[in-house]
């Protein structure tokens, strides 16, 4: 049957900002859905608050609303479309993660969908409830003959205690309707139960938690299934978790297809999965079901299901080449599986289940170094911030590739010094899962532990441990062989070992370069295989490749000759991490699409399964490979060979994928690879403070005084000369890694000890820190002659808070025309001085009317997508064209850039866009269960961002806060406790809050100052003060935890007692999920946002409408 003809207009809800537990995989899913629906002739309206996504580009929907994803704002969008005669017929919420699903449930429950006659498609309200509600899902499992863990849904702490008494400790606590395992965990004691169930009841939208028997240590599996309205069901992929139950699947290494299932177990799982899917009632879309198997007796239970496209769906799509989100969207509008053609073979229908003749391994990327004090134990609450995926012809090859894809500083086994430990100590470590468990398993085996001992200690299946044991045996062979011959080297490469790993074992080969030279002499190169969904039964029409070192020297590569068009290789950004997220993938995708249109053949290299760039139809060719020098060079050789006789490889783009490809630029150029755009030498010049300082001196541009130090003595002398506070940081980092504001010599000494370990080959930078300065961010283009200012952003927080964590406004809200003109002149001088061809990001600080240059990055920045959305100018597309020879004048003529003016000449009535960072503090706790500090500083900690856009700053800021944190309060009590230096600045914002009807609560010193300024307030004591002696009975922390505070304003003190008090206050605010503002500027912005909300004139506006207003 063809698609439903009664559907003309579909609303798609995106997933909002990148969060731990809900990341870029939903940008990938939503982008696919929007493309499919529009291709089918449907009108598509999209709501998503995340400007960094491809799906919020205006060309992917007819009406794109970058607005908060709340029931209220979604209703405003539905109403606006209805008022304009564009009635929305259906809502597709299964492709936007838990955020979209929860919003759809709320819209259904509050009657909005019924009032506007909007149908839920993909999964209806009842199906969502049956799949998401723990008790209803458990009843369904029982009904179809399956078994669940013994459990009970509890709504109160009394019910929780009663259930724990029946089941016995330990138990697992799981809230309903949350994502990434938020609020869940293992409770070993009564105290654990009280704490975790309390958090769980607070974090569950339905205010209930599931208390279940512990199945920790069992083997975990997942099935990805799809069903159409004719009841056809396919199992797309089976996935096995390397780690046992107890580690969230998002934090586990996972393998596809499942490796250790017996055929009988798989068939049982498959039958159960299909029966559950039918009973839940997901009739037109995909779902993910998780199972656990007891390795001792084979008992199989069903854990849970997601009645939507999930994180695992993105992984399964990339692993198999079966586009789950795309097919789910087609099923939702009425197609059946047998009517949908497989994109890769162009012959088989989607009802053919994919067959894999390779192994896929996904590994998580963590960022514990960003959160000092956070407990790094892996639990049922997800903590990883990104992931990498690799494909190989066997498990151990894929494992080796994925380990070097993670970019943690270790390129797999044997590339870092071993810890000093005994075999018993390592085995004991393995009993507590951490992010270093793969290395611990290999080390324990190398120290003499048996496969059985390691499997028992770690809970990892003996089959996986045995695979790593085989690698340990191969290591011994590599160390002991008198000569490294072709047979042994080929075996090592077939086992996933990199040249760098082999070089670490054979010092006589003089490093990675020597190993590569030996391989070339022996004719050992990878062959590139194709992902074809059918184990080569049909020919693949889509070039989606992975490398493998086959044992058979005669094995042939499957890269088809392509000699017609010049090729451009685009290096992606690798796994998401704090400091390098999907903003960089966004730029890579734009480069691929625009260069294809301009007549180039685009080749994407990346290893991140969450992203749009690794979709098989984003670039003309995709290599799912690690972004290392060795792997990229082999792809370059393969592409050069496949293009023989034609124009060949025009160049490699390293400027768009963040620090990862930039770090490869110099070595690639030395190996003869043509780098397009800004040269590696110019990139190095901008990073080298001495050389960059010379550029600034020549241009007459001031910069904060600084010095370079390799010892503490040097750093001490520089700091004493410049004057404290100073900003210290290593060079060549992204996301402010290792950056600190230092107020005294003692702290400086501790920092230098750590920092020199962090980056031994580069000196530490010691800069004067400009307190109370306005920070300014600029994105610009340069074609070598002309400079085009893309956008000038004014940070809301003062300089000193990492730009990635600071909210910012575009156009600037307090800068004058002369300030903007100074910024333009400085940016032009830097672009020409460095030699930029492509994108440039410059950060400035404005203090006492002097514009200081903080740093310049000749690459795409994380603000490029935000600026592009706010100004209607596709900066990444323009950059890609410039790198391959187009001029700014030419791009103005073509309409890619504004015909006149640029981002520094915005109209006076232009709407204001505010970007706000989204921070993951609620995910991380200390080992004792305490919250980590939410104080911002020069090291980046945010995982994602949102955008608010409106006709004035207050309204735009209010939207950004609603999108990021669930809105600013409109009434209630505001608690204020600030450092002495901030008291004068905060009088007016707090006075305005009091005038708006808020009650004010403050600690003694702040209360006294507020009363002197005519602001009535109640007093509470500081957390570390005892009650009595004239002090109030309640402390600030007690008031917050009691739910009596709607917002906190707390600026940090020095390093004394009050600083500790500030930590407790901020931690309490995070745990109660209320706004916590830590800067004076943030407080002023919040007041403007609250005023705008209370006025009630905040509307919604599509990007298409906004861009037509801007004249683009």
From Swiss-Prot:
Mg(2+) 4 binds at residues 855, 857. It is an enzyme of class 6 (ligase). Its cofactor is Mg(2+); Mn(2+). Mg(2+) 1 binds at residues 290, 304. Binds 4 Mg(2+) or Mn(2+) ions per subunit. GO terms for cellular component: cytoplasm. Belongs to the CarB family. Large subunit of the glutamine-dependent carbamoyl phosphate synthetase (CPSase). CPSase catalyzes the formation of carbamoyl phosphate from the ammonia moiety of glutamine, carbonate, and phosphate donated by ATP, constituting the first step of 2 biosynthetic pathways, one leading to arginine and/or urea and the other to pyrimidine nucleotides. The large subunit is composed of 2 ATP-grasp domains that are involved in binding the 2 ATP molecules needed for carbamoyl phosphate synthesis. The N-terminal ATP-grasp domain (referred to as the carboxyphosphate synthetic component) catalyzes the ATP-dependent phosphorylation of hydrogencarbonate to carboxyphosphate and the subsequent nucleophilic attack by ammonia to form a carbamate intermediate. This is Carbamoyl phosphate synthase large chain. It comes from Mycobacterium sp. (strain KMS). The lineage of its organism: Bacteria, Bacillati, Actinomycetota, Actinomycetes, Mycobacteriales.
